[in-house]
């Protein structure tokens, strides 16, 4: 038997230190994964807000271009127009086809079976044909119309929404419209 032979291998302390380092690394990776997932959700909510703001501006422009509304009607209700003053939940655009007017939410538009506006979430196969409608109940819209002069109006659409973390976020779009097509 040899005496004084040196043992090789890991000691218990070395194994514990390696375990702690590995645990800290894995916790950091899990945190980064969670933050990445949260960013995807936040960017999806921002994309919806941006699209709903564009939709409102397009409704105003289309109403002007097709003479659905007169130039004087392209105003908030307080100024003799048809667009609701203040903030309103996102609702289906009613019979006139224009958002943020008095008749919003009075008719069900496919695929939204209620008065609330919705988006279709893809089904299990990733296609919209078997998707389910998801109401946009955490979004609100405000259309503010300001007359710059008799031939020019400023339209500001603000979409406000609540994130999954409970934070209020908003997206605003401003454009100018004249009575000329």
Locate predicted features.
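N-terminal leader/signal peptides at the extreme start of proteins
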Residues: 1-10
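Aliphatic-rich helix starts adjacent to a transmembrane/signal segment
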Residues: 10-54, 67
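Low-complexity, Gly/Pro-rich coil/beta segments used as flexible assembly/activation regions
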Residues: 47, 51-181
């Amino acid at each position: 038997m040899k005496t004084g032979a040196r043992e090789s291998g890991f000691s218990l302390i070395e194994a514990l230190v390696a375990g702690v380092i590995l645990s800290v690394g894995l916790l950091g990776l899990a945190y980064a994964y969670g933050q990445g997932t949260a960013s995807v959700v936040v960017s999806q909510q921002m994309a919806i807000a941006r699209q709903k703001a564009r939709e409102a501006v397009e409704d105003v422009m289309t109403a002007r271009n097709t003479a659905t509304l007169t130039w004087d009607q392209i105003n908030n209700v307080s100024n003799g127009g048809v667009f609701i003053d203040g903030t309103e939940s996102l609702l289906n655009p009613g019979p006139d086809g224009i958002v943020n007017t008095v008749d919003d939410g009075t008719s069900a538009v496919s695929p939204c079976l209620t008065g609330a506006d919705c988006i279709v979430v893809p089904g299990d196969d990733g296609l919209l044909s078997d998707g389910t409608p998801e109401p946009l109940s955490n979004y609100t819209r405000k259309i503010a119309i300001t007359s710059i002069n008799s031939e020019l109006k400023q339209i500001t659409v603000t979409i406000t929404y609540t994130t999954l973390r409970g934070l209020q976020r908003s997206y605003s779009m401003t454009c100018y419209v004249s009575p000329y097509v």
